[in-house]
Regions:
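An edge-strand/N-cap motif at the start of beta-rich repeat modules
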Residues: 1-21
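N-terminal carbohydrate-binding/catalytic regions of secreted carbohydrate-active enzymes
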Residues: 15-59
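Loop/turn residues immediately N-terminal
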Residues: 11-15, 58-61, 104-107
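Repeated scaffold domains used in trafficking and secretory/extracellular systems
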Residues: 37-44, 77-93, 125
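A short beta-strand motif characteristic of beta-propeller blades
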Residues: 26-34, 70-80, 116-125
Length: 125
């Protein structure tokens, strides 16, 4: 199928692929706006606005400009802070909130407009 998807690289790039040729990078954007040592861990599109969001290792959310690769921080960061090396975000379109889970069991809900944690749920086992 003619389906576009995106992936992060370890060197702060966002690659675009097509499912017709998943091994071929169609385009690559160098991402700008991270602090020194900060990494992006996960991305997901917000269904309500079609914006691409990213989670950083510094417990912050960003939106990604798909034209120039610039990052815009959302809020000032969230608490409790990440206590993991592996994390994933996923939008719940029904309530327009971000689910954040980590390899250490953290399970948070984040607000896409403020970047704040709005709920801490039970640990994921």
């Amino acid at each position: 199928p003619d389906l576009v998807f995106f992936a992060l690289t370890d060197d702060a790039k966002l690659n675009r692929y097509n499912a017709k040729a998943p091994g071929t990078v169609e385009a690559s954007l160098t991402l700008s706006g991270l602090s020194i040592g900060e990494k992006l861990l996960s991305i997901d599109f917000r269904p309500a606005t079609y914006q691409l969001y990213a989670l950083s290792s510094n417990s912050r959310l960003y939106t990604i400009n798909l034209t120039d690769g610039s990052l815009r921080v959302v809020g000032t960061g969230f608490t409790p802070v990440l206590n993991a090396q592996v994390a994933n975000i996923d939008f719940n379109p029904t309530v327009d909130r971000i689910r954040l889970v980590t390899n250490t069991g953290q399970n948070l809900r984040l607000h896409p407009e403020t970047g704040a944690a709005v709920a801490t749920d039970g640990n994921i086992n």
